[in-house]
């Protein structure tokens, strides 16, 4: 097997017992939207995954890695153009943005129970931070703008159990079936917010 299957921890026993395996990827996305006077843009660059696997002893292997679990990357702005309003207040603009996300750090081990059937166990640690902010500004100094936002820091633990069964379907074919069950994850953390004008 030339690839790491990070979805099912039981799959990591299907490998050369003398080799180390690693996988790394990155992703990038640039988006810009505009409708009337409203604009939105986001630029993201993140790891896709980082994983490596090592053999432990015969018919057993281990794997560890890091991958994004969720992400937030947006920014939009718009202006008030109604002459009846800005004639008194001056130009008004609103801007909002959000960045950050959660990552999953994991470690797994698997063993062949008997020919074709393997069992894998995985420990997951979730962590990350999200920042969101909102700004309201006036060009007329007689009016106060507003700024508010918050930072959320979260972490939690979870697990996964995987099974995989492989059998031959001919001289050059094989069929692989697998299943995983994940435990519920209860995230905890703290929120720091601010509001001022």
Where are these regions (language model features)?
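N-terminal, post-signal peptide beta-strand-biased segments of exported outer-membrane/organellar beta-barrel
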Residues: 1-73
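Outer-membrane beta-barrel porins/channels
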Residues: 1, 55-197
């Amino acid at each position: 097997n030339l690839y790491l299957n990070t979805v099912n921890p039981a799959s990591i026993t299907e490998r050369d017992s003398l080799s180390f395996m690693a996988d790394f990827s990155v992703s990038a996305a640039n988006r810009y939207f505009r409708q009337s006077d409203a604009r939105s843009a986001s630029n993201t660059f993140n790891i896709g995954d980082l994983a490596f696997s090592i053999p432990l002893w015969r018919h057993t292997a281990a794997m560890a890695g890091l991958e994004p679990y969720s992400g937030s990357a947006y920014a939009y702005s718009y202006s008030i153009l109604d002459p009846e309003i800005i004639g008194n207040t001056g130009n008004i603009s609103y801007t909002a943005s959000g960045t950050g996300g959660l990552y999953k750090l994991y470690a797994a081990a698997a063993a062949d129970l008997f020919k074709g059937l393997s069992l894998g166990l995985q420990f997951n640690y979730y962590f990350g931070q999200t920042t969101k902010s909102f700004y309201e500004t006036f060009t007329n100094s007689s009016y106060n703008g507003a700024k508010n936002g918050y930072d959320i820091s979260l972490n939690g633990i979870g697990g996964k159990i995987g099974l995989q069964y492989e059998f031959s379907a001919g001289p050059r074919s094989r069929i692989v079936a697998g299943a995983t069950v994940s435990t519920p994850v209860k995230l905890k953390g703290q929120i720091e917010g601010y509001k001022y004008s």
